[in-house]
């Protein structure tokens, strides 16, 4: 059995790490490289960096900090932000990232997933999906350009249908960002995760809502996700990585020890 992954998420805006609630009202958390070094030292399995405004500003993520991060950590890390072509993906990967993640650009051109996965392998192609429960439609819908509230809008894609589509196109992994839960620290959306798990044949990562050790356990156990991603609880030291792993292992989870 493959070990479940504990992943720290670092949202990047103008060269610093930020964090908001439900993808809004972001506040500065700290500098990129020191935080990356800290998490690697504390025993995190993987890091994910989202340049949250790169796509809306029509620019590629700044590669200088990617190179700097690669020099100070020895764990896998994924980078997202304005990747719109195979050449963009090449630039990010050649700067030191182990994986690239695309979101809005995949919604614009789903074939981009295929092009990148065929060039570099499915193992380094992650699809981020920003899912919001629309009460009027009584369905989870995919949101686009979520890095800028003034440009965010709801697509015509139901989350479940988009999950199927990106797998057909060559996604190697899916990060399901549950926007209704983001930053609230009240737990992951277990029901939504469990439904997506049924149709997701590639590694599935839960994102949005972690506030305690129990929340991580619930997502791993009840929804059988392959990894759990969090930001606020790690940034604010609400949950210590070493303690989290120790408690999950004690409850029978296959987790890499610190």
UniProtKB/Swiss-Prot annotation:
Localization per Swiss-Prot or TrEMBL: Cytoplasm
Subcellular location, principal: cytoplasm
Keyword Oxidoreductase annotated: no
GO biological process: L-histidine biosynthetic process
Keyword annotations of the record: Amino-acid biosynthesis, Cytoplasm, Histidine biosynthesis, Lyase
Stored Gene3D superfamilies: Aldolase class I (3.20.20.70)
Annotated GO MF terms: imidazoleglycerol-phosphate synthase activity; lyase activity
Positions of the catalytic residues: 11, 130
Entries under Pfam families matching the protein: His_biosynth
One CC-aspect GO term: cytoplasm
Catalytic reactions of this protein: 5-[(5-phospho-1-deoxy-D-ribulos-1-ylimino)methylamino]-1-(5-phospho-beta-D-ribosyl)imidazole-4-carboxamide + L-glutamine = D-erythro-1-(imidazol-4-yl)glycerol 3-phosphate + 5-amino-1-(5-phospho-beta-D-ribosyl)imidazole-4-carboxamide + L-glutamate + H(+)
EC class: lyase
Assembly description: Heterodimer of HisH and HisF.
UniProt similarity note: Belongs to the HisA/HisF family.
Function: IGPS catalyzes the conversion of PRFAR and glutamine to IGP, AICAR and glutamate. The HisF subunit catalyzes the cyclization activity that produces IGP and AICAR from PRFAR using the ammonia provided by the HisH subunit.
Protein known as: Imidazole glycerol phosphate synthase subunit HisF
Organism: Buchnera aphidicola subsp. Acyrthosiphon pisum (strain APS) (Acyrthosiphon pisum symbiotic bacterium)
Gene behind the chain: hisF
């Amino acid at each position: 059995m493959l070990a479940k992954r504990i992943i720290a998420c670092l949202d990047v805006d103008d060269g610093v790490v930020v964090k908001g609630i439900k993808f809004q009202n972001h506040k500065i958390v700290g500098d990129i490289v020191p935080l990356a070094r800290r998490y690697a030292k504390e025993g995190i399995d993987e890091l994910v960096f989202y340049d949250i405004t790169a796509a809306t500003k029509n620019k590629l993520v700044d590669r200088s900090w990617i190179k700097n991060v690669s020099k100070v950590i020895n764990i896998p890390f994924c980078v997202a932000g304005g990747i719109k072509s195979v050449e963009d993906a090449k630039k990010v990967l050649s700067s030191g990232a182990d994986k690239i993640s695309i979101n809005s650009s995949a919604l614009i051109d789903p074939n981009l997933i295929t092009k990148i996965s065929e060039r570099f392998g499915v193992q380094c192609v992650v699809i981020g999906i920003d899912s919001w429960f629309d009460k009027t439609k009584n369905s989870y819908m995919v949101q686009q350009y979520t890095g800028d509230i003034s440009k965010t809008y709801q697509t015509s894609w139901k989350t479940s249908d988009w999950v199927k589509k990106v797998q057909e196109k060559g996604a190697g992994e899916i990060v399901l960002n549950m926007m209704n839960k983001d930053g609230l620290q009240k737990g992951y959306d277990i029901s939504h995760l469990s439904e997506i798990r049924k149709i997701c044949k590639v590694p599935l990562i839960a994102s949005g809502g972690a506030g305690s050790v129990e929340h991580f356990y619930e997502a791993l156990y009840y929804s059988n996700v392959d990894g759990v991603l969090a930001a606020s609880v790690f940034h604010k030291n609400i949950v210590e990585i070493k303690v989290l792993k120790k408690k999950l292992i004690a409850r029978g989870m296959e987790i890499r020890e610190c």
